[in-house]
Amino acid sequence: MSSSRREPPEAPSIDHLVVADWLGQLQDASFDRAGPAVRKAYPPQRRMTGQQLASYLLRRTYALASSTRPDGRAHAAPTLFSAYAEAFWLPTVKDAARIAHVRAHPWLALSILEGEHDTHAAVLIEGPAEVLTTVPEDLRHITELRNRGGTIAWAAYWLRITPQRLFSFAEHAWQEG
C-alpha cells in the first residue's frame, strides 16, 4: 500500500452518511449534466461511491486549488481544505494571491489526487467561491484537527466553494485497496 493511503486524522464526529449522500448526489447530478467526452473519460465503474468519496475527502487534507488571475492567466497552488456544511473551505493567509483572484473571478477548482498508474484516484470539484473573514468555530476546530492539531491562526481569510460539479475516478486496484 502506498504511504499516501494512511488513516484519517481524528476529527469531530461528522454524520458520515449525510456527507456521503450529499457527495454522491452531487456527483450523480454532475455526470447527468456532463457531455459525452467527460462521461467516457470517467466511466461509471471507475467512479467512487458516495461512501468512498466521503472517506477519501476526510482522509486527504490537501488539494490543488486552481483560480484565474485578474488578467485571465491560470494559477494553481496547494491548500489545506475541509468539507463542511455542503461546501469546501480553504483557510488562506492574508496576502495570498488567490484572494484577489477569487474577488476578480469568483470561481475555484479543486483537484485531490493520490497514487500512480493502477492505484491512482482523483476527485475534481469546481464551483463559485467567495472570500470570508469569519467562519463557524466548528469549522476552525475541524480544520485544525485536519492540520494535525496545528494552529490555523494564520488563516486571515477563508475561501468557501459551493460545488456545482464533482467528478471522481478510481482505478480498480485503488478501489480494491
Residue ranges of model-derived segments:
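Short, conserved active-site entrance elements at the starts or edges of catalytic domains
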Residues: 37-69
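Short beta-strand segments in beta-sandwich/barrel cores
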Residues: 63, 88, 108, 129-130, ...
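Short beta-strand segments
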Residues: 60-94, 110-113, 121-124
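Short, surface-exposed beta-strand-loop junctions and turns on beta-sheet-rich folds
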Residues: 96-98, 175-176
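Short acidic (Asp/Glu) patches
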Residues: 94-96, 106-111, 139-149
